[in-house]
Amino acid sequence: RVTLAVPADALATWLIPAFADVPEMLFDLKVDDQDTADEWLKRGAVSAAVTGHARTAPGCDLFPLGAMRYIATASPEFMKKYFANGPTAEALAAAPMLTFTPKDKLQSQWMKQTTGKVLHPPCHLMPSTHAFLDAALLGLAWGMNPLALVSEHLKSGNLVALDAQAPMDVPLYWQISRVMAPALAPLTRAILTTAAAHLRPPLAKSSQNRHI
């Protein structure tokens, strides 16, 4: 089996088609935050990883993949209750928030980008991409969801963007052990091709990183 470290959001949105392009391979996936996926490489526990860091792990090659776009979203009812006057610092500090795991800093980064302040709202820890989305749809809290998963909900009105003009793009990278690179060349090609079809060109300057 090929052991990989991958973010949950990438797995839920675009990685599976890449794996399907190399049906001769079997996979053992370690799901982790993209900010820390490279630690699996440093420990020698995986052959490759989708990471959120442009710095190359020792003994690895790095390939930029593009960026996943995230949108701060909530249900219409939640918006009326907590954000009647928009996502102000006061409102964000009081509104329940979704967090994937303690490693997930995306919501905090978005709030600081939006308000200029470091806020600590009440939050739910919910380490599941689809539960994260369901929680937003059902009005439990707001959270940063991949645009690929929420675009239809935004069109239908089931979800509302807290600020439609303030998306966040999370750059992703494919890092692979040089020792394993020749044997995994078909997988690398599949990853790069699939990423090019699904991800956005990364922002010139971006430090926003998440579980995905």
Question: Can you describe what each PLM-predicted range is?
Answer:
Residues 1-58, 212:
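Central regulatory/effector-binding core of bacterial HTH transcription factors
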Residues 61-140, 149-168, 197-212:
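C-terminal regulatory
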Residues 9-13, 35-36, 57, 105-106, ...:
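Short alpha-helical
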Residues 1-5, 49, 73, 98, ...:
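Short, well-ordered beta-strand segments
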Residues 47-51, 141-145, 162:
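Paired acidic/hydrophobic, glycine-rich loop segments that form the ligand-binding mouth/hinge
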Residues 33-34, 51-55, 75-76, 128, ...:
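Beta->alpha turn/N-cap motifs
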